[in-house]
């Protein structure tokens, strides 16, 4: 179905009328007593653990042996670490990038990104600078089953309005072995990842004009991106590999990791992101582009749309958004064809102006979101809550949506809150997810996404206050109802 027809009774008028998350990898853990359990990786770079179906939790200790802790303890540690780090990061982000927590952040034209390739003393990259220059910049890049390069991705999402070009440096060779930088502490977190980044920066950027990587003239490089040799811990690689993440050198130093922010030739490097050269835990295939696209989207002040809380179970945007699990979409499930930006993110960046609907109507012949800047918006008619609205967008299984689980209309429910966006907690409250979907089949499930679109497998063609699922609000509408 290339063109969709959906009758929308505009319920919102009177109620009649958004680091990458852990790849959902399973592993058989051998415990100290020799017994084995099957567990799924949970959490993110802040704190991660292995969770079994019956609710047991394990972390890999410094000897790479599974150590059982209570699930509550694991979640409490993650929550405490996130809160402590967020308190510092929020202040830093809002000081140096006012767009964090803003309703819009229009961006267009050309920007430059800095990428550094890294060898460890005992582990060298299997792919060359030329290959990575193609990976980040080449038009129509198709190696390793990718749908395009990182530059292609942003050009496409912006409908040609925003070009992100990359300077790829290196590889540089670090002074220590892989196991030093990726060694885990007792909580399973990398001890020296920021030290790796700082050392790489010092080796790579001597004599370079860093001002071209400062997008807003605040004296800070918006992000330096490091690709390190070998595998990443997020995809079931050994515990002494590094978990891809975004962080600040200044914040890492507070955890005794690295020297802090670096000021070179009058420009400061603080925010960094990093990811692995290779996908999975075996073979020599380059990782997909999804993680790089996700991390550079943070430079646009776009928050994570997955549940960043300790539990991490909320649906969020799941496979439908680059800023959630969609960063892994692709033929092999490693981000070769990451999910496209939603209409919300395109609207936020100034690349799409939705058509606002104010009367009940039929929505016909909507072009795919990957092809044309078309979406429809239905706002809560209560003027006290202008940040709550529905967005309607058409997804077809082609282009960046080629690996979407279904085709048809996707209905997003947005309830913008500046603090939630600023604190990177958009979808952390199960009963009030602020950037999620209304699935046609009524099932918000990580493992049942084929029925999310309209009409979809459930053949639903109407969304009203009495339909199933029903059009609901978080805030009172103009009639005093939700």
Language-model region placement:
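N-terminal prosegments of processed precursors
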Residues: 3, 19-107, 355-356, 367
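Active-site-proximal segments of metallohydrolase catalytic domains
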Residues: 100-107, 148-265, 375
């Amino acid at each position: 179905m290339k063109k969709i027809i959906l009758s929308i009774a505009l319920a919102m008028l009177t109620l009649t009328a958004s680091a990458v998350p852990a790849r959902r990898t399973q592993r058989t853990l051998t415990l100290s007593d020799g017994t084995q359990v099957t567990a799924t990786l949970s959490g993110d770079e802040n704190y991660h653990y292995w969770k079994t179906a019956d609710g047991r939790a394990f972390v890999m200790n410094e000897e790479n042996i599974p150590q059982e802790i209570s699930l509550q303890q694991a979640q409490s540690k993650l929550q405490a670490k996130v809160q402590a780090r967020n308190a510092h990061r929020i202040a830093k982000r809002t000081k140096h990038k006012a767009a964090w927590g803003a309703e819009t952040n229009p961006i267009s034209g050309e920007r430059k990104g800095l990428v550094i390739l890294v060898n460890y003393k005992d582990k060298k990259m299997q792919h060359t600078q030329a290959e990575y220059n193609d990976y980040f910049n080449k038009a129509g890049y198709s190696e390793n089953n990718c749908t395009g390069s990182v530059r292609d991705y942003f050009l496409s999402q912006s409908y040609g309005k925003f070009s992100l070009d990359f300077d790829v440096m290196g590889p540089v060779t670090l002074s220590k072995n892989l196991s030093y930088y990726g060694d885990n502490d007792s909580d399973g977190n990398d001890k020296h990842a920021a030290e790796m980044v700082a050392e790489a920066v010092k080796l790579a950027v001597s004599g370079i004009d860093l001002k071209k990587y400062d997008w807003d003239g605040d004296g800070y490089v918006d992000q330096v991106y490091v690709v390190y040799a070998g595998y990443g811990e997020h995809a079931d690689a050994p515990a002494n590999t590094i978990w891809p993440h975004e962080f600040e050198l200044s914040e890492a130093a507070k955890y005794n990791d690295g020297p802090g922010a670096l000021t070179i030739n009058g420009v400061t490097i603080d925010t960094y992101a990093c990811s692995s050269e290779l996908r999975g835990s075996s073979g020599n295939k380059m990782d997909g582009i999804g993680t790089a696209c996700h991390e550079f989207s943070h430079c646009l002040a776009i928050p994570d749309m997955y549940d960043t809380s300790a539990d991490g179970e909320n649906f969020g945007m799941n496979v439908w958004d680059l800023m959630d699990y969609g960063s892994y979409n692709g033929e092999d499930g490693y981000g070769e064809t990451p999910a496209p930006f939603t209409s919300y993110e395109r609207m936020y960046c100034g690349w799409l102006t939705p058509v606002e609907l104010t009367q009940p109507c039929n929505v016909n012949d909507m072009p795919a979101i990957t092809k044309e800047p078309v979406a429809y918006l239905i706002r809560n008619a209560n003027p006290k809550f202008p940040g709550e609205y529905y967005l309607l967008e058409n997804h077809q299984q082609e282009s960046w949506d080629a690996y979407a689980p279904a085709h048809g209309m996707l209905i997003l429910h947005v309830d913008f809150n500046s603090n939630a966006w600023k604190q990177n907690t958009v979808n952390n409250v199960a009963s009030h997810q602020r950037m999620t979907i209304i699935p046609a089949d009524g099932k918000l499930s990580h493992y049942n996404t084929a029925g999310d679109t309209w009409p979809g497998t459930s053949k639903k063609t109407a969304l009203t206050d009495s339909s199933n699922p029903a059009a609901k609000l978080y805030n009172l509408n103009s009639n005093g109802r939700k």
